[in-house]
Amino acid sequence: MVSSLIISIVLTLGQPTLAAPETPIESPSPVPSATPDRWLLMRSLQGTFPGWLLDSQRIQISGWTHASFTASSATHEQLPMGFNYRANEFLLQQNWLRIERPVVTSGPSEPTFGFRADTILPGSDYRFTLARGLFDRQLTANNGQPNRYGIDPIQFYAEAYFPTVGRGLDIKIGHIFCQYGVEANDAPSNALLSHAYTFIYNPFTHTGVMGTLKLTDTWSVQAGLVLGSDIFIDPASEPTFMGSVKWAPPTGRDSILFSVILGSGRFNQTYNFHNPEILDFVYTHKINSRLNYTFEGLYGFTTNLPDGGFANWFGILNYLTYDLSPRLSGTTRVELFDDVQGNRTGFKGPYTTLTAGLSFKPGRSITFRPEMRCDYNPDSRPFENRHGLFTTAVDVILRW
């Protein structure tokens, strides 16, 4: 009954509206360049003292609940297919809370400062995204195995924006998402319910400092010094460089992003921790007003492994998305992920996956994503001693 009531409220609200201008007790300064979307929580606070107080400080509180059900040819688990990893079960994948004070990227010439804090509390996705040294005892709390649901303070950083440096310099300090690839940790940013192996078995987060400099309207560069990949403050951390170059003409149909993660590349045998090197290339092309194509190629490697010394892997991804209407789109994803030595998934060989799904938004506060997916590895039997896996799944994202 409660879930039905929530969904009915969201359907009634439809898409979030921009806040109506009001005469504040004290006008906040500076004002963001664009008023952010008002989801259910912030809309319910409008006209109240807490709402005014948050607005006066440019602070937004929002989040979403993400739940899924996957019908599978497997009996219990679909690993190494991750995130929606349980077969024929309901999963509450993300209860995501976001508190942020966005920086102002247009208008004032003075620097502005902000922050963001993202937390999964709780959700089953935590077991894939949790960084070492950050509440990671949850991963062994269940007789040496992960709890089904856990908490992950997945991202938190302070931010400063300097509009007069180049065309704008943004600096983040804290625990931040990796800046490469197509897919993302936060569920609403993805076109499909399930994730590609190329996303699952490569880094999710970094801890350190990152700067993004806009050189022109077309070119931007990014550089950061971090403590490694998927690690917070821990004896296994080590200096690592992350950087990227992006080409994206504002009026063009194409964009290119080349990203790297470069450190020692050596497996830390003392602390049993991976320090992979990553090279990633993303190309996007807008075929027409409805049809978009995205390509990603990734190569990763690590050395100093106890057995064999060297391991490498690569992923090739093709996405095709067609917008049938403003509320309905369809996406296909074709992936080849070759875990050459079996270092990433535990089973060597090439994984071929084909996924087709829909994204339906009856209102901007709610999204349904049904999909069908086939996975196959001819060299190993990773799926409960089978070469292949077939799944049909559906999820719902309720934004609040």
Spans of features found by a protein language model:
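Outer-membrane beta-barrel pore domains
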Residues: 24, 83-84, 128, 141-145, ...
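Short glycine/proline-enriched turns and hinge-like loops at secondary-structure junctions
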Residues: 109-111, 234-238, 273, 309-311
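Outer membrane beta-barrel
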Residues: 47-228, 237-242, 246-255, 321-322, ...
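Inter-helical turn/loop segments and adjacent helix faces that build the functional surface
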Residues: 230-232
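General helical secondary-structure elements
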Residues: 34, 39-42, 94-97, 112, ...
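Basic side chains
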Residues: 38, 98-101, 116, 172-175, ...
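Short, positively charged
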Residues: 37-39, 186, 345
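N-terminal periplasmic/intermembrane-space "pro-region" immediately following the signal or transit peptide
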Residues: 2-81
